[in-house]
Amino acid sequence: MERVYNFSAGPSILPLPVLEKVQKELLNYNGTGMSIMEMSHRSSYFQSIIEEASNLLRELMSIPDEYEVLFLQGGASLQFSMIPLNLMNTYKKAGYVLTGSWSKKALQEAEKVGEVQVIASSEQEKFTTIPKLDGLLSDEKLDYVHITTNNTIEGTKYVDIPHVEKVPLVADMSSNILSERYDVSKFGLIYAGAQKNLGPAGLTIAIIKRDLIGEADRSCPTMLNYETYSKNNSLYNTPPSFSIYVTKLVLEWLKEQGGVSAIEEQNRMKSSLLYNFLDESKLFTSPVDPTYRSLMNIPFTTPSEELNSEFLQKAKERGLVTLKGHRSVGGMRASIYNAMPVQGVQQLVNYMKEFELENR
C-alpha cells in the first residue's frame, strides 16, 4: 500500500527521509552491529546522540546559554504537574490563561499544588479566540504565568506572546514548537511533547532557564524534579532513547530545510491554501476567529453530521486520513505539521472543492 497523507494531531506525520534513515539504521546503527533500541544509554554512541539532539535544538531555536535543554518522559500532561511542583515555591500561586482543553487540564493539575489565578479566558467563546491580555499581567505576586501557544483541539494560536516582566512565562508549545520563530528569552520555561512536531511519542522536551532549577520543595519526587535531569544530563534513569534518536534525525532534517524561518514560511503557505478555500466555501466553515488561526491545526465542518461522515469516508478512500475532529469539537481537523508536504494540503483542498461541487 502507498503511504497516505496523515493529518493526525498526534502522533503525527514524520518526514519520509527520516523514516527511511531509521529503516536503514534499524538493525545496525553506525557499524555497532546493534539497533538503537538495544543500545545502552550509558554508551558513548548514545551520549553523542543526545548531545547532538540538544545542540541542534539550541541552534534551531537560538536558545541562550542560560537555558537547559532537558529530555523527559510522561508527555506534556506530566509537565502539568511538574511545573507547579518545581516553580510554585515563593507565593504558592500561579496565573493561567485559559485558551482550550489542554490549558484547562494544566490549570486543574496546578490547583492540586497551590493557588491558581485565571488571568484571562476564552471559554465563553468556546475557545474560538485568544483573550486580550492588555494590563492583566501586572500582578508580581505570582510564581509564574502559564500559556498554551497553540491550541491543538480548537485551532487557535497566540499572534503575539504576552509581555511578562518580572514573572517567569511558562509555555506549552507541544503542537507548534519549531513551526515558527519564537524569542526563547521571553520565556522562563518552554515544554513540548515530541509526537507532533519533534518526533515519535514517548519524549517530552523542556527548555528551562537555569535559575528556575533547584527550587522545588523537598517533598517533590525525584523523578518530577527538574534538578534531577539537569544534574544528570537527562540520564538519571533510562531515557526514551529511540524517541531521542528519531528526534535528532527530525532536527537534522529541519536544518536541511533551511531551519525554522524557512519552515515557518512553508507553514504559512500551507495554512493559507486551506484557509483561503474555507473563506470562499459555501459548504465548509471554520469556527475560529481569523485573527488567531493556528498554522498547525485547522478545524472545519459542514452543515450536518451526515455530510461530515461522508466527507471523512471518501477522504480516507483517497488516502487523506485522520481528519476527524476532536470529540469535544466535532467536524474535521487537518493537522499540518512541519512534515506535512505542500502536496498533501493541496490534495486535501482539491478534494474539498470536489466534495462541495457534489453537495451543492
Curated annotation (Swiss-Prot):
Keywords: Amino-acid biosynthesis, Aminotransferase, Cytoplasm, Pyridoxal phosphate, Serine biosynthesis, Transferase. Pfam families: Aminotran_5 (PF00266). One of its GO terms (molecular function) is pyridoxal phosphate binding. Its EC number is 2.6.1.52. L-glutamate binds at R42. Transmembrane segments: none annotated. Pathway: Amino-acid biosynthesis; L-serine biosynthesis; L-serine from 3-phospho-D-glycerate: step 2/3. GO terms for biological process: L-serine biosynthetic process. Disulfide bonds: none annotated. Its cofactor is pyridoxal 5'-phosphate. It catalyses: O-phospho-L-serine + 2-oxoglutarate = 3-phosphooxypyruvate + L-glutamate; 4-(phosphooxy)-L-threonine + 2-oxoglutarate = (R)-3-hydroxy-2-oxo-4-phosphooxybutanoate + L-glutamate. Pyridoxal 5'-phosphate binds at A76, S77, W102, T152, D172, Q195, N237, T238. The modification N6-(pyridoxal phosphate)lysine is found at K196. One of its GO terms (cellular component) is cytoplasm. Binds 1 pyridoxal phosphate per subunit. PANTHER family: PHOSPHOSERINE AMINOTRANSFERASE (PTHR43247:SF1). HAMAP family: SerC_aminotrans_5. Homodimer. This is Phosphoserine aminotransferase.
